[in-house]
Every structure is written in C-alpha cells, then in structure tokens.
Amino acid sequence: MLGSERAVVEEWLSEFKALPDTQITSYAATLHRKKALVPALYKVIQDSNNELLEPVCHQLFELYRSSEVRLKRFTLQFLPELIWVYLRLTVSRDRQSNGCIEALLLGIYNLEIADKDGNNKVLSFTIPSLSKPSIYHEPSTIGSMALTEGALCQHDLIRVVYSDLHPQRETFTAQNRFEVLSFLMLCYNSAIVYMPASSYQSLCRMGSRVCVSGFPRQHEKQWKELCGRIVLDPEFMVQLLTGVYYAMYNGQWDLGQEVLDDIIYRAQLELFSQPLLVANAMKNSLPFDAPDSSQEGQKVLKVEVTPTVPRISRTAITTASIRRHRWRREGAEGLNGGEESLNMNDADEGFSSGASLSSQPHGTKPPSSSQRGSLRKVATGRSAKDKETALAIKSNESPRDSVVGKQFVQQQADLSIDSVELTPMKKHLSLPAGQVVPKTNSLSLIRTASASSSKSFDYVNGGQASTSIGVGTEGVTNLAATNANRYSTISLQEDRLGHAGEGKELLSPGAPLTKQSRSPSFNMQLISQV
C-alpha cells in the first residue's frame, strides 16, 4: 500500500469522527467526489495484515447504522470484497485476521433483519407476471387468456409472498454461514442500481474466485492467489447470479460472461439444480454482441430474450384448428366446383350428376370427395330453396289458383315430354356387315364413354312402351314419345325450378325453342346389337 493511499484512508477516518450530526447529510452528498478513497479502501480490505483494516471495518459499520441512505450505500459497495476476504480467510483458518470482517458482516445482517423498534422484519416479494418476458420464458408461447369474469377479477391482482423471520446471529457457524451471506447478497442486489462500476467489478471477481478456487480451472485464471476449495450453497449462488446478471448489462460484459461460465462449471460439479437452471437461462438469453453502453449512467437492465430453438408458430396446431382449415378449403373448392357445375350444365344440359360421372372416359381421374361434397351442397341448397319457394307460393295462392296451377304444371310437363329429343354425336351410324336394323322391340342402347344417362327412368302412361327409331341418310335419329315418355331426373328438377315462381312466362306449344325456353336435351351415341 502506497503512502498516499494510506494518507487518504487516515484522513477519511479522522474526518468522520469529528463530524457533527447536523453535517452528516452534506457529508454524504460529497463523499462520492473523493475518487482516491474507494481504491485505497479496497486495498486495505484485501490486505488482512494491514493495521488499518480494523478501524476501516468499524468506520464502515458506523456509516451503515446512520440514518443517511447514501452512507449505507457507500458501505454496501464493498460487500462483495468483504465476503470474498471472509471466505478466503475461513478456508485458511486465520481466525485472528478474520475477526473484524466477521463482526462487520454480522453487524450489517442484524441491522437489516430488524426495524427501528427492534422487531424482526418480514420481507415481501412480488411475483412477476408471465405476460412479460424473462430469462425463463417468452410471453408469445403462452396462449391468450379467455376474457372471463374470473380473468377480469385477477387482472390487477398482485401476488405477494413473504419471507420467514430471520433470527439474529452473534457468531458465524458452519450451519448459518451461508444463510447470513445469502441474506447480505439479497440486500446488495436490492440496492445494486446505486452501486458504482468498481463494485460491479468486485462482484464479478468474487463470484469467479469462490467458484473455481481449489479446482483445476483455477490454473487457467490470470490471478495466481492460492486458495483452498470453498464450500458454497445453492441459494448463495442464485443471489450471486442475480447481481452478475445486472452487472453484465451495465458495463461488465466480459467479466460477467467469465463469471457466468465459472458458476456453471461449479454448479455442474456440485450438481446444484437451482444455479444450473438460472445460469443456463441467463446464458441462452444473452445477445450475440455486447449491449450498447455508450450512455453513461443508464442503469437500465436490457433483457434480450433469444430462444435456444427456432421460433414456432404462435397458433397452436389442434384438432379444432385443423377442422377449421379443412372447412375453409372445402368452402373455397365448393365455390369453384359450383362454377364448374354451372358451366357443365350450360354446355350439356339434361345430365344428372350421376350421369356425368359415369360418362367420363376411362383415362380421366374421377372427381375428389371434396368436389362431390361441394356438388352435393349445391344440390341440397337448390332443393331447400325450391321447397321454400313452393311453400311461399302455396301459402299465398287461393284454392282457385291452386287448381289453375295444377293444370299449368300438368300442361307444362306434357310440353317438356314432347320436346325431348336425342341428337347423335356422330352424323353417320355404321352397322356391322351382314346385319340389318333390328326390330324396335329388340333394340338395346349401350352406354359409351361419350355420354349416357344412368339416372333416367321410363315413365309409362298405361300399356307397354313402344319406341320407334328412324335412321336417316344424314344420321339424324328422333325418339318419338307416343305412349312412353323418357326424360331424366335433372330435366324434371329444372322444369320444376323454371315454373315454380310467379310471373314466369308460359311455354306455348307453337313457340320456337330458344336456349332459355327449350327443354333440356342430351347427346347419346347409339350402337345397335342383335
């Protein structure tokens, strides 16, 4: 220790002793201006054989027991260095040199656990909300809470837990040593935002040394001070990590990362679960680069939450979400399928859905289940709409109108029956050699890949159906419906749709057939067999 540093410490000791009580506040406001005092006090504390160590410890205790908060914080900044010297001397069994530091630590502990009246303090801790990020979780991974009455009641609810009562201690023992030291570190962390940079450096050095002393990793360090293995407590290491985490983001990035690795190293050797959990969470949440420390006196902890695994989708994949996705897809395909079905009906009217399916070529792929479902939905919607229209007409019409309506429907059905014709796909029908046109009764229609009607049926008005087929030179085939009338199911439905509403134009027998008024027809290729 240099003579100048010794002189600074002696001046500080004598100055406070002669200070009256009325000037304590002004003295506390100017104490931080003495730049040479703090480094000199660190050197006195580190040297256990220095004769100024005992008066310095006594002076620090007097500052801490004063009513001025800034004087308490001045003493707290040396707490990490005092703990390191105490543990080092405890391992070396130098009880004589350790007495004054032990008394100072016990004095601070006993002052903090009791209030002004001498009653034990009950410390309260507020549980943080999970909606805010931390080193353990991201709020995005938590599902949104339902807006219920119970959730609204707990919106402003603050959860507070209380600590147990801490008994007073007169001496250090192996059983209560880390109970006292952990509580002292808790007091230090509660005021860490007011500590200078020198205190953060002392905290990081203390954490690294107590973790690797006596282990092979000690030889990798720059400091060569020999020390035995120091017994540690998991709770003390967690409090140490709390202070180190703040120091890392406030100017001690390199030292903080070094002590973090040393704490993980010691926790793995000791199999301490709590320090491992906190230290690994801290390490996985660190940014790649050091935080911006350009602003002096910032004193703000910047928490950069970086997940260890790639981010997953915020919406959980559940059975309900898959079902909703399938419904949306089927709805979109249903709209497309509805447009395609309308186009198909315009080009090839008179076909039923079953007929169009059965008339596809063998090389084409049948429609999917979703398309069949969409066509089924369109047909169901049409039938439901037809029923509603028919009920509305039936409720509005009088008995006389109902009779006229029945006659109109019967007349229109006869018209549609008479207007059905079959036009061949080819203009020429070729018959095999040596065969003649068979009789009408023995003629059979073979369904081919071009078009067919599997949903058609025969409607016979009395007697046996007789069909006459004529094959001309131009290949035009007409089906004369005399006693038998052949028409498809879709033809009946479209006739019903076309004439169910009011104000529709009646199809007169002599009027020419247009695209809107003609009866639906379909193409069919005829192949005769014997």
Curated annotation (Swiss-Prot):
Principal location listed in the UniProt entry: cytoplasm
Subcellular location: Cytoplasm, Cytosol; Cell membrane
Coiled-coil intervals: none
UniProt keyword list: Cell membrane, Cytoplasm, Membrane, Phosphoprotein
Tissue-specific expression: Expressed in the central nervous system. Expressed at much lower level in oligodendrocytes than in neurons.
Residue positions, PTM Phosphoserine: S321, S341, S430, S442, S444, S491
One Pfam family recorded for the sequence: Hyccin
Region (Disordered): 328-404, 502-530
Comp. bias (Polar residues): 353-373, 514-530
Domain of life per record: Eukaryota
GO cellular component assignments: cytosol; plasma membrane
Modified residues (Phosphothreonine): T30, T306
Family under the similarity heading: Belongs to the Hyccin family.
Subunit structure: Component of a phosphatidylinositol 4-kinase (PI4K) complex, composed of PI4KA, EFR3 (EFR3A or EFR3B), TTC7 (TTC7A or TTC7B) and HYCC (HYCC1 or HYCC2).
PANTHER family, per the entry: HYCCIN 2, HYCCIN RELATED
Function text: Component of a complex required to localize phosphatidylinositol 4-kinase (PI4K) to the plasma membrane.
Name of the molecule in the record: Hyccin 2
